[in-house]
Amino acid sequence: MRAREKLPVLWLALGDFLRSEGKEEQALEAYAHGRRSDGRLESREGRVCLMRVCWASVARGVLGEEDVRNAVLWLREACACQDGELASEEGVKILRAVMGVYEERGGGEGLELCKELEKYSDVGVREEVAVWKRRFEKEMSVSMDCSE
């Protein structure tokens, strides 16, 4: 393993240590460094760092545009790589937060994301995605009916 490939591992370990010491802000900075050190999110550790950054935004109850973009990126990569973190409590809450934002926007983006996430192997996540997909489809059909 080359030194560059080890960076996400080191940042994740540092972030986890700082979090265990109650230093949440410093941990979040370490996770952000871990995410940036794995630009293409090729490593599990880089994806976990991004998940922890997304989770911090969800836990604060504030999702800005960049937070939504990061969360969607993480959801897509976690699904593509079949990361178990997507099925974790934090992962499902990130999923729900993003879908909630997309629901407020009208559902089109959410429906597209649901189609991608249907490929994830965990039954619980697929069921959650199916619920959101039905909501978006219903919302889209109602908005189509209203436009006529």
Q: Model segments located where?
A:
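Short coil turns that delineate tetratricopeptide repeat
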Residues: E5, G39-L41, D83-E89, D122-V123
